[in-house]
């Protein structure tokens, strides 16, 4: 049962990009809907818990949530540039590299020689995996430009996701205490990021995208439980498995086309990212 709970984040976060893509809408509509869904879920959690708030917890969690919106909105943009099956392994790999480097240099993780060797070996595998998943066999000017745009977009996205994780870690804020102020930060930032655009912000797709927002929040809550049930290392490692669902789902359910060579390299790349993520989880323990 503990492992089942620990797998919920991977399932929720793996399916979420597929649901967002199926619902459709522009990135601004997707980020607003997703953050509204996360806020609704956070309010429900707040009612049944007793979080302890201080000014630091509220402000830092709010800013952390704003960084998440920066990360998520740019991930949505990358879906339109390179597709879900390329975006998710690239995004996951970049996030793992970013959060791990912060962990080493800011929080002095991997405190032994063996953990440093394991951790940096993991980063090497992840970087190789990133390159493999981004491979294009038949390049034309348009696809090449889209890939460049996608990588730049995902670098910005990763800054947002890393900031989201690092801020609460820096101030040693419990995930339970952070949930509501984080969600408020997500909504405010999502609304601000979506101001400069001609498309309507509130459409049918906006409200439907509350569903993946609830899915993301469910995965986040399950991760808090799984960290207690199976430990941070195992919980973290299992949560990375969602990239398999989103990558394969992008190909099978969203119809994203790959040549045979691209498909093989994507699978190898995803496996390397997962192995690297698992190794990082072990190094954290």
Swiss-Prot record:
Q: What is its main location?
A: membrane
Q: Name one Pfam family in it.
A: Sugar_transport
Similarity-based family = Belongs to the GRP transporter (TC 2.A.7.5) family.
- Its recorded name reads Putative sugar uptake protein lmo0169
Q: Which branch of life, at top level? A: Bacteria
Membrane-spanning intervals of the chain: 5-24, 31-48, 53-71, 84-106, 116-135, 151-173, 178-195, 207-226, 232-254, 263-282
Q: Give this protein's Gene Ontology molecular function annotations.
A: carbohydrate transmembrane transporter activity
Localization recorded for this chain is: Cell membrane
Species assigned in the record: Listeria monocytogenes serovar 1/2a (strain ATCC BAA-679 / EGD-e)
Keywords for this protein: Cell membrane, Membrane, Sugar transport, Transmembrane, Transmembrane helix, Transport
A Gene Ontology cellular component where this protein is annotated is: plasma membrane
């Amino acid at each position: 049962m503990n492992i089942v709970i620990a797998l919920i984040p991977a399932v929720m976060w793996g399916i979420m990009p597929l649901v967002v893509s199926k619902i459709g809408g522009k990135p601004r509509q997707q980020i607003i809907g997703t953050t509204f869904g996360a806020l609704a879920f956070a309010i429900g959690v707040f009612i049944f818990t007793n979080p302890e708030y201080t000014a630091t917890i509220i402000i830092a969690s709010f800013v952390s949530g704003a960084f998440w919106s920066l990360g998520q909105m740019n991930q949505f943009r990358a879906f339109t540039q390179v597709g879900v099956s390329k975006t998710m392994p690239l995004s996951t790999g970049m996030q793992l590299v970013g959060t791990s480097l912060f962990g080493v240099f800011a929080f002095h993780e991997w405190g032994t020689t063996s953990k440093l060797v394991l951790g940096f070996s993991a980063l090497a595998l992840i970087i190789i995996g990133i390159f493999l998943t981004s491979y294009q066999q038949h390049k034309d000017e348009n696809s090449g430009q889209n890939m460049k745009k996608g990588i730049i977009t995902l670098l910005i996205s990763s800054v947002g996701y890393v900031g989201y994780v690092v801020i609460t870690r820096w101030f040693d804020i419990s995930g339970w205490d952070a949930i509501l102020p984080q969600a408020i930060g997500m909504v405010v930032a999502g609304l601000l990021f979506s101001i400069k655009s001609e498309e309507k912000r509130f459409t049918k797709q906006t409200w439907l995208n509350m569903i993946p927002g609830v899915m993301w929040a469910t995965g986040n809550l399950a991760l808090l439980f799984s960290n207690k049930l199976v430990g941070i290392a195992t919980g973290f490692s299992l949560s990375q498995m969602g990239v398999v669902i989103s990558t394969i789902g992008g190909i099978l359910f969203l119809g994203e086309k790959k040549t045979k060579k691209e498909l093989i390299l994507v699978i190898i790349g995803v496996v390397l990212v997962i192995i690297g993520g698992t190794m990082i989880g072990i190094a954290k323990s």
